Amino acid sequence: MGEHNHAEWRAAVHDPEVVRGMLEDYRAGLGIDADHERADRTAGRRVQRPLLVLWSTRDDLEDLYGDPLTIWRDWADDVTGHGLDSGHHIAEQAPEDLTTALGEFLA
């Protein structure tokens, strides 16, 4: 993450309002967000634009959920992407690779 980013993160997780916001985001994922996803699936709604999926290869995402591209193909027809050699914090740990992938996708 880098010393500067780690210091900012450490300060943020000691701010009760930041922690509350983080927990509310997780709570929404189990509640209202999940309700909206079920409604979208029931209605047959899908992502109608090209979708780029990037993920860290030094994280447990694939172990927990399987292939991210396969998962997102349930939600969109035009899915591309790949793993980046990074831990959980892709923007901080692999900024060049992330920038390249985004630039190629948006070109």
Describe each PLM feature range.
Residues A76-A107:
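Catalytic active-site module of serine/aspartate enzymes centered on a nucleophile-bearing elbow/loop
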